From Swiss-Prot:
MPN domain boundaries: 260-397
SMART domains: ZnF_RBZ (SM00547)
Similarity-based family: Belongs to the NPL4 family.
Keywords assigned: Metal-binding, Phosphoprotein, Ubl conjugation pathway, Zinc, Zinc-finger
GO molecular function terms attached to this record: K11-linked polyubiquitin modification-dependent protein binding; ubiquitin binding; ubiquitin protein ligase binding; zinc ion binding
Function statement: May be part of a complex that binds ubiquitinated proteins and that is necessary for the export of misfolded proteins from the ER to the cytoplasm, where they are degraded by the proteasome.
GO biological process assignments: cellular response to virus; negative regulation of smoothened signaling pathway; proteasome-mediated ubiquitin-dependent protein catabolic process; ubiquitin-dependent protein catabolic process
PANTHER family attached to this UniProt entry: NUCLEAR PROTEIN LOCALIZATION 4 (PTHR12710), NUCLEAR PROTEIN LOCALIZATION PROTEIN 4 HOMOLOG (PTHR12710:SF0)
PROSITE patterns registered for this protein in UniProt: MPN, ZF_RANBP2_1, ZF_RANBP2_2
Keyword tRNA-binding attributed: no
Assembly behavior: Interacts with TER94.
Record protein name field: Nuclear protein localization protein 4 homolog
Length: 652
């Protein structure tokens, strides 16, 4: 009989039956505090809470105990039934003493209650209704127009009825003539399409039974997660919760841009004139638009309308890009014209035979296609111009920014090669993990961890001498694992967003400090004087001229150029003619007429030696009262025999 209480206790408390559940529930009702177990990625945490507390209080208790934010609590391990952070629903109505709830960290901005901060009720309802039970971010992402159009497009590849294989009537469909998905491998291989388009890749990932409800692009992290309280900061401590995972580089199967098209060959020819004149390399930014590319299913094409050349110091072998104080002005003019910065272009040309115009082939499969330094520069520029994406955890993923290299091919002719770097390369460059090597331009190098920075291990796979796939540490790293090919071309029928020059001399391009290429008032006067009154819209439709007028300091044209830029964008001659009657443009025309009628003027800036010698001569060189005059525009003191200013070229 002494063993009876022990047997009863084992029967009640150790066996998962009705008696055990009944006794546990009675203890839950009688006790003022109940025990709730919370399972998260860090382990199991026990929370004591009153059964009469609401679920909002439970969320606050979990947040204070685990030091987390942006989470949800679920009843099941597979996160099906969520406990809403309600201020009216009690803990006792949803949970029992000893129950376990499962914590899930939410990506992006969460609509769930995780703190005592007051939320706007209307915003809460909107985010909850628009994206229920989904892992995608709840904030709204404004994608590019071409992305919005492709998201709504059907995307399937239509096929005609095969007269040999199809045995049905014209209205029927079979496996030989039914439409294909845009990611069909046989179609891509047949048409020699190397990479999937970005939207075809999204269609492939969202084609399952759940229709991609939980599909999301996660950002690659190469840094230690900040704020870990389990140990001292790096280098004194690190744990699995804050340590970034090792990265295995894979060749990217998709690309954000499938083709780069220059509207006409004259755009590139004007860019190459600097190299032809000086022999120095040159770099520029591509301005244009994105449009649908029909040759690739759900493809995107970058159409280039102009090339802007920022301040730079170049030699025969190198280019050093300088800070550009007018970068925002250029972007403002481009935006008013319906353009945006879509890529960058640089030259790598060495003359082989100047008499026949051939160049040396210095890039190819036997050497390299793009250097590690250029790859890092492309990654930095792509990080500055991210691609808005509604499937990304932070609202952006990848980039449509392209890289164009002008170099020599096998036939020793000048040709263009297009590239983009992968999302993995962008992450390595963003977190300062990738550097170039000194002796091999085709090899990069992943930094080693130091006291100031922890760098995760980066691996890539290649085949050894016996054909086996082996994993290598990315020290060094062939940059070909980070590249995506993007074809570059020109259309058969040229397109002209801006003026089509025939025999007239175009307006000089900015930041070219050589004779005949300077942008000054004398160049503006000579350029506009070559056009008639009825050709004003054609004369003004030059991207480099519009940028020069926009950033001109002598006349306040910037505040009045809105209608002019709209006229150029819409090619409206009547609206352009209305701009000619504006007072500030009339003043500019009068200055041009006065400058054209004078005998002075200069097309270049005075040298430093001339200025120094003039200053050294002092009052012996000129009489300030009789033999000099002061420019009303730039206040420079000019010699008396000049009829236009030696600095700004404006008339006396």
């Amino acid at each position: 009989m002494a063993c009876a209480p022990l047997l009863l206790e084992q029967f009640i408390y150790k066996k998962r039956n009705f008696a055990y559940a009944f006794v546990r529930h009675r203890l839950f009702v009688l006790c003022k505090q109940s025990l709730i177990r919370v399972q998260s990625a860090e382990g199991i945490k026990r929370i004591e809470i009153s059964p009469k507390s609401n679920l909002k209080h439970l969320y606050d208790s979990v947040q204070n105990a685990l030091k987390v934010d942006g989470f949800g609590l679920f009843k099941e391990r597979n996160f099906l039934t969520e406990l809403q952070a309600s201020g009216s629903q009690l803990v006792g109505t949803s949970l029992r003493h000893g129950d376990m709830v499962y914590l899930k960290q939410m990506a992006g901005t969460s609509s769930r209650r995780t703190s005592t901060t007051v939320l706007d009720s209307q915003a809460f309802k909107t985010s909850t209704i628009s994206n229920p039970n989904s892992a995608r971010p709840s904030f709204n992402v404004i994608e590019d127009d071409v992305d919005q159009a492709l998201s709504k497009a059907d995307g399937t590849i239509k096929r005609e009825r095969d007269s040999k294989l199809c045995h049905h009537n014209a209205n029927g469909r079979c496996v030989h003539c039914s439409a294909l998905e845009p990611y069909d491998e046989s179609y891509l291989k047949e048409h020699n399409i190397k990479h999937l388009s970005f939207h075809s890749y999204i269609r492939k990932q969202t084609s399952g039974m759940d229709q991609g409800k939980y599909f999301v692009f996660d950002d690659i992290n190469c840094r230690i997660k900040p704020g870990c309280r389990e140990h001292p900061p790096w280098p004194k401590g690190i744990c699995s919760k804050c340590q970034p995972s090792a990265i295995t580089l894979n060749r990217q199967t998709y690309r954000h841009v499938d083709n780069v098209m220059f509207e006409n060959t004259k755009i590139v020819e004007r860019f190459l004139n600097y190299w032809r004149t000086t022999g120095h390399q040159r770099m520029g930014y591509l301005y244009g638009t994105y449009e649908q590319h029909t040759d690739v299913p759900l493809g995107i094409r970058a159409k280039v309308a102009a090339i802007y050349e920022p301040p730079q110091e170049s030699t025969r072998d190198s280019i050093n890009i300088q800070p550009d104080e007018f970068a925002d002005d250029v972007d403002a003019v481009a935006s008013a014209l319906g353009l945006k910065k879509i890529g960058w272009i640089f030259t790598d040309l060495i003359t082989d035979d100047a008499s026949i115009g051939t160049v040396k082939q210095i890039r190819g499969i036997e050497s390299h296609f793009i250097t590690a330094q250029e790859c890092i520069t492309a990654g930095e520029l792509q990080n500055r111009h991210p691609n808005p994406c509604k499937y990304a955890s932070n609202g952006v993923f990848g980039s449509k920014f392209v890289t164009i290299c002008v170099t020599g091919d096998k036939t020793k002719q000048v040709h263009m090669e297009g590239y983009a770097v992968s999302a993995q390369c962008m992450a390595l460059v963003r977190d300062n993990c990738l550097i170039p090597t000194k002796d091999a331009p085709e090899l990069g190098y992943v930094r080693e961890s130091t006291d100031k920075q922890y760098v995760p291990d980066v691996f890539y796979k290649e085949k050894d001498l016996y054909g086996n796939e082996v994993q290598r540490l990315a020290r060094p790293l062939p940059v070909e694992y980070l590249l995506v090919d993007v074809p570059a071309s020109t259309p058969l029928q040229p397109i002209y967003t801006f003026t089509e020059y025939d025999k007239r001399q175009p307006f000089p391009i900015e930041n070219r400090y050589i004779d005949g290429h300077l942008q000054d008032f004398n160049a503006l006067s000579c350029y506009l004087s070559a056009w008639g009154e009825e050709e004003f819209l054609e004369a003004i439709s030059d991207f480099h001229l519009l940028v020069y007028l926009y950033k001109m300091d002598m006349l306040p044209l910037r505040q009045h150029m809105g209608p002019l830029l709209e006229a150029v964008r819409t090619k409206n001659p009547n609206q352009a003619a209305q701009f000619k009657v504006v007072d500030v443009w009339k003043l500019l025309e009068s200055l041009i007429q006065a400058s054209s009628g004078g005998s002075g003027g200069t097309t270049s800036y005075p040298s430093g030696g001339a200025s120094a010698s003039a200053g050294a001569s002092g009052s012996e060189a000129m009489d300030l009262d009789a033999n000099t005059w002061t420019c009303n525009h730039c206040t420079f003191i000019n010699r008396g025999e000049l009829t236009s200013c030696e600095i700004c070229s404006l008339p006396r």
